[in-house]
Structure formats: C-alpha cells, structure tokens
Design a protein with these regions (language model features):
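Glycoside hydrolase catalytic-domain groove-lining segments
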Residues: 553-666, 712
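Substrate-binding cleft of secreted/luminal carbohydrate-active enzymes
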Residues: 334, 341-343, 347-348, 356, ...
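Aromatic-lined carbohydrate-binding/catalytic grooves of carbohydrate-active enzymes
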Residues: 406-440
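Active-site-adjacent "subsite" loops/lids of carbohydrate-active enzymes
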Residues: 371-391, 464-524
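Catalytic domains of carbohydrate-active enzymes, especially glycoside hydrolases
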Residues: 397-420, 527-532, 610, 688-691
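Loop/turn residues immediately N-terminal
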Residues: 41-45, 77-81, 87, 137-140, ...
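Short coil-to-beta transitions that initiate beta-strands within beta-rich domains
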Residues: 19-33, 54-69, 93-126, 153-170, ...
Length: 726
C-alpha cells in the first residue's frame, strides 16, 4: 500500500517535467499529491499514502470529478454532488429535470425520482460560479455554483443527442454545446434566462439564438454534418482563454478561433477509428483518454497538425498499472480520477488533474463482477431460425447442417413472434391466460437436439408489438387513440388518399401488467433450456400519420418514453436470471440518440448484457457511406457501426449486430448485393473486435453465409475485390 501513491506522484511529476520543460519548479511549488480521488461504478473513494481507501459516497456511478475554486463537484448518475472539504456532501440538483422510474414491489407500485442522465459538467474559468450541464435534450446553466439551474434550451434540432458542454467568457459569457448529429453550437447567456428547470420551457427566447460552430470540423462521410465532438475544453492560461474540441470516433483535435468562428485542426491521427474523450488542460498540455492509453498534446509548439506534436505520455503504462492497483484495492470499475496536490485552505490553491472516461483504458467486456452474464453471452456467432422451420425434423436438419458446416454456435428463434403468438406450449397458466399458442414447437425436443450440436439458444421475444394482447379484455393493454376513444391503429395514406393500416398493433409500454407477462414468459423459457432472452420491439410505435393521437393510459405522472423502457428493463433484470439482449434500430446504435424509439444505448447498456443493432445497409440512406469504392459500404457500416456502439455503450454491454443476409430491392442492393456483400459485413464485425454477430433472413435462406475458412482468412484483398456487377 505504501508504494501505491508514490507511483502516482512519480507519474505526474515526471510526465510534466518531460513535456513542459518546467523541471524542478513544479516540485518546489506543488510538492507531491496528498490524495487521489477515484470515481467508480458505485461510488467515490479517497486514497492516501498511509491509509486504506476511504469511501466518501456510495450512491451510484461517478462519471467525472471537477475541482474548482468553489470546491469539489462530482458528476454522478444521481445528479451533481458538492463538497468543500470531502467530508460533507450535498446535492446541487435544484432546477434539473427529473425522471420517474416505476418499480413493482410485492405487487404494489413504487416510484423512484432521479435526476435525468447528465452528460457533462463544466465551470467558467473566468467566473467559477457560472456552471453548465446538460441532459440528452436540454442545456442547463447555473450562476451560483450549482445551487440552482435554469434551462437555456438546446441547439436547434428535433432530435435529442447532446454530448458535451462548456462555458467561457468570450466578450461575455457563452455556452458551448455539442450534438451527436448536428455538431457544435454556441449561445450567449449574458442575460439571466427566463426559462426554468421544467423541460416544457426548454425553448430559447428570441434574444437567445444558438449559433452553429462547425466550420473546420471534419464531416461525417457522405453527410453534411460534422462527426460527433466528444468534449469541449475552455482552457485559461496566462490570462488568455482558449477553446479546444476533441472528436469522439476519429483522432482529431481542434482549437476554435472565436473571432472567425473556425476550428483549426491541431492533430490528425492515422486510424480509421479511435475512440477518445475526457479532454482536460494541465501545465500547457492537453490531456485526453484514447483507447488503451492516456495521451498528451503539448501546446508549446502547434505549428504542425500531424503526430509530431502528439506525445503519448512516457508513463502511460505506470498510470494504467496504478489504475489496476486501485481496482484491486477497490473492486469496482474505475470511471474517473482526480490527482490532488497539497493545498493550504481552499481547493483554489491546489493544482488538480482530473481524468474522466477511464473505461477507455480497459479491455472491452471484462467487468464480469458487475455484469456476470456478459461472460456467458460473449463470442456467440449464429443465425435467426424461422420457427416454422423447426416444426419438423426434416426442415430442422437443414439448419443443423448450417450450424455444423459453417462452424456457428448460436441459434435465435421466435418464442413470442411478431404477431404476439406463443410458439411453445406454456406450463404456467398465467401465460396461457394472456397469450395465444400457435403452431408450437416441441420445446424439450428442440432444446435437446440443438444443444447436442453445441448451440447456444436465444429465445426471441417480441415485446410491445403484440396484436394478441392488444385485443385482450376489450383493449385493456392497447395503446389508445385519444380521438376515436378506441385501441390505436397506425396507418398511412397512399397517393390516392386511401387509408392503409400498418401491420402493427401496440400494447402500452408503461403497463406493469405487460411487463409481468413478458417476465413470466422469459422465466419459463430460461427454465426450460434457453440460454438467453432477446427482446425485440422494446420501443414505442414510430409510424403513422395519426401518431399524435396515441395515448398511453398506463403512464404514471412524470414518466416519459425513456423511463418506461428503463423501468421495464429494471423489472426484467430483477426477474430473469439469464443474459438479456435487445434489438435496436441501426441509427440508434450509430448516433448517441434515442430519437423516435426511446432506445438510448448510452443508458440501456447499464441494464442489459447484449445490444443487437440492425445495421442493414439496405435500411440506411442509399448514399450513406457509399463513397469510393462503393463495394466497401457494407464493411464500413458494420466496422464503424460496431465500434461506435461499443463506445456509446462504454463497453457496458456486448455489441452483437444483426448481419443482413437478405436482398432488398433498393438502389444499392440492386447493384452490389452478392456473396461478398454479406462477407464484408462479417469482416467489419470481426475487425471491430469480433465479439459476436447474428445472420438475419426472415425466411431462413442462408446460402450467402461465408464458410469458416473464408471468414477467418479473408483479408484486405477481399474487401477491395470488385463485385463484378455493372
């Protein structure tokens, strides 16, 4: 234990001396660190040289530790904590929006009020009492050190997705915010806003205009939008305010020229993809966390925009070893850390180095203590088996042959299908009372046969799209039509104006009775041999010209779409002792947003073990990532999509994409669909870490599945091979 803190002291002092040229003056001015704060998935700890770790707070995940002249601020999943002395703590959440989660305890409803998930927290170096934070769809400003917060709106977008915020004095106070899709915006906040913490008042007044600041930022390929900015840093040094930005998914670092509103590129790496986040300033250097290492960028000479100015700290290995030692002493995943120099009196006399997003330093999917089912679900490779093909031995044998010859180890099969029908005979009478059995398989025989061939069995359960439950008890569970006062049915109108109903009927995602029905089905399927339960259509309806007429009668006050999904998953997690996976839209895995569906990967990853994005190339805009050579589009989508989703999820859940093993009559597929189309998707997943995938063909035709020797040995030459289709 006595060797632990000196390691940290050596790391920072040596690194600063080596990169800034300040040499012994650093040691004379600051001495060594007197303590280290560690934020984990479950709390905040203090480590000192002579004592065991001290638990300071144990209320939840610590995302960021911010030390200002005001005191110590801690960004958590319960909101914002504040202390002046690390001994006495208080919440500073007044005015921040609240989400309501529903729990069912011994058959009775209970409600938990939590601050909405906060994305970032920063203060104005010129006025530390001025602070800024953000939810997914609102920016909040404080002028009194976080004692109260006001909503100043969000960048002009109908889509949620705020990632980072900052506040600076730029001839008056200015708030900066990055949106995952639409880039960076700025808002002058010289006057105190009239809006309150109520989300309904989130619109800026006419005097408050969000100004786009995307000039100079690298665009997301084949789009008109800049790629996501992970963090914005306001760095005040020698009386000068400078603003820096770091992109999330590519090695790009910028400085903003406020006068010209232009981002100048400071550094560009060579990797197609590299996750990075947690940008801070320390002794005339920028520090940030990349995959596998802590990185420094010296500000002493920025005439070059290549890797010459990027210096991976020579003590990176020691830092990572120290973090691992901290995790041995504190057996919880480390999320953030703050190194504290000794100070006399207030924190303002200390020189802190605060690091966040430390999950990036760890190998993916190793938090088995926190989520034990991840180990079971990892590295599963398989296909979706249409349940009708499992009814007879002859048709099932075709898929056993595919399983064996293609060297796959997983089968996904419907047990509650898209029409709400049960494809097995339930033993629990509560299931039979709500569901309808239709052409069931012999469950015990099926499980026995497939396990004899080494199959990991996944039961697909369609959740909130359920025509059978929709019509039960006079529509008791249905999403309701507020105009017609009857169960809601989405429809569209064709060119002639004729109404055409969508082939979907939805039950209310807020209904705890629907949750219990799904949980009971899941429990029985696991008990009867399924290894994993996979939920599809775990979302709200998204289609229909009459979508605005939907009413959710089971909704309790304060709940929204996200809190309904989270409440459902919390309920399931407490009732099902097996790996849980969910299917999501490809766009919700690509961007940090739950737009349209309520599927926020960043939040959902805490509650499930596997997330399965449907990155089907046919379902994206046909020009999306179709830059030259266009044949590589399927590879790009799956390679980058898998890595992006892993980053958004912070590696808290396995990303196991569905691979498109079917042809769709759209422009790109008409020209390029062939065996290589499927193989390129697979190679994208494999090159993104190879943690698992599922082939999807809803009629069960898998002629295009690559042979094992092809998928294991195909290299760059395959990726660039012509499709031979004109």
């Amino acid at each position: 234990m006595r060797n632990f803190l000196p390691l940290f002291c050596f790391i920072i002092v040596f690194s600063v001396q080596a990169q800034t040229g300040l040499k012994d003056t650093i040691i004379r001015e600051t001495g060594t660190y007197n303590s280290l704060l560690i934020g984990t998935a479950n709390g905040l700890y203090q480590l000192t040289e002579k004592a065991a770790p001290v638990l300071l707070w144990s209320g939840g995940m610590v995302k960021k530790i911010l030390i200002s002249p005001q005191g110590y601020y801690v960004l958590t999943d319960q909101g914002i904590l504040f202390s002046r002395d690390l001994a006495n703590w208080e919440y500073r959440n007044q005015g921040l929006p609240i989400k309501v989660l529903k729990e069912i305890v011994q058959g009775k409803k209970q409600f938990i009020q939590k601050v909405q998930d906060l994305k970032d927290l920063e203060y104005n170096p010129s006025d530390p009492a001025m602070m800024v934070t953000a939810t997914k769809d609102g920016v909040y400003l404080s002028r009194d050190g976080g004692l109260s917060w006001s909503n100043v709106g969000m960048p002009p977008s109908k889509t949620n997705g705020i990632k980072a915020v900052a506040v600076a004095d730029l001839n008056g106070p200015v708030v900066l915010a990055s949106h995952s899709i639409y880039g960076v915006y700025a808002l002058s906040v010289a006057e105190k806003p009239a809006a309150t913490g109520n989300p309904a008042s989130a619109k800026s007044s006419p005097a408050q205009k969000w100004l786009p600041l995307n000039q100079g930022l690298e665009l997301h390929e084949t789009t008109e939008n800049s790629d996501e900015v992970a963090d914005i840093l306001v760095y005040r040094n020698s009386g000068k305010t400078r603003i820096f930005a770091l992109q999330s998914f590519r090695e790009r670092l910028y400085e903003l020229d406020w006068d010209t509103k232009w981002f100048t590129l400071l550094y560009k790496g060579e990797n197609d993809f590299k996750a990075q986040d947690g940008l801070v300033g320390f002794y005339n250097s920028l520090w940030f966390v990349q995959q596998g290492n802590l990185t420094q960028f010296s500000l002493n000479d920025r005439t070059s925009s290549n890797s010459e100015n990027l210096i991976v700290a020579p003590t990176t290995d020691q830092i990572m070893k120290a973090v691992r030692k901290a995790e041995l002493l504190i057996p919880e995943p480390t999320m953030s850390a703050a190194f504290l120099f000794p100070s006399e009196g207030e924190p303002s006399s200390a020189l802190p180095l605060s690091l966040s997003e430390l999950w990036l330093l760890r190998e993916p999917f190793r938090q088995y203590r926190e989520k034990p089912y991840i180990r079971t679900a990892l590295n599963r490779e398989g296909f979706y088996l249409p349940v009708n093909h499992a009814l007879e031995e002859k048709s099932l044998n075709r898929y056993i042959h595919i399983l064996d010859t293609k060297k796959l180890n997983m089968v996904v099969i419907d047990m509650k299908d898209d029409y709400g029908r049960l494809r097995f005979v339930p033993q629990n009478p509560e299931i039979a009372a709500k569901g309808r059995v239709f052409k069931p398989i012999d469950l015990e025989q099926f499980v026995s046969t497939m396990k004899a061939h080494g199959a990991y069995l996944v039961a697909r359960v369609v959740v909130f799209k359920d025509p059978e439950l929709y019509k039960k008890e006079g529509g008791k569970y249905a999403v309701w039509d507020s105009v017609l006062n009857s169960p809601w049915q989405g429809y569209y109108e064709n060119a002639e104006g004729t109404r055409i109903d969508y082939d979907e009927k939805w039950v209310d995602p807020y209904s705890e009775e629907v949750w219990a029905y799904i949980a009971t089905i899941s429990q029985e399927l696991h008990q009867r041999g399924f290894d994993e339960i996979q939920f599809d259509y775990i979302r709200f309806p998204t289609d229909g010209v009459n979508l605005s007429q939907t009413r959710f009668r089971w909704r309790d006050p304060g709940m929204d779409a996200e809190s309904a999904i989270l409440s459902f998953l919390r309920y399931i997690r407490g009732h099902v002792e097996a790996p849980i996976s969910i299917d999501i839209y490809g766009a919700n895995g690509w961007y940090r947003t739950g737009a349209r569906t309520g599927q926020e990967v960043e939040v959902l990853a805490r509650y499930v073990d596997v997330i399965c994005p449907m990155y089907y190339p046919s379902h994206f805009e046909q020009t999306f990532l179709a830059n030259n050579p266009p044949e590589l589009r399927p590879y790009r989508i799956y390679y980058l999509g898998t890595l992006r989703a892993m980053t958004i999820a912070r590696n808290q859940a396995i990303i196991r994409p569905y691979i498109q093993a079917f042809y769709l009559n759209v422009a790109y597929d008409r020209k390029y669909y062939n065996d290589d189309y499927v193989l390129r998707q697979l190679l994208g997943v494999q090159n993104a870490g190879n943690f698992g995938y599922t082939y999807w063909n809803n009629i069960g035709r898998y002629d295009e599945i690559p042979l094992p020797e092809t998928r294991l040995t195909a290299g760059p030459e395959l990726l660039f091979k012509s499709s031979n289709i004109d």
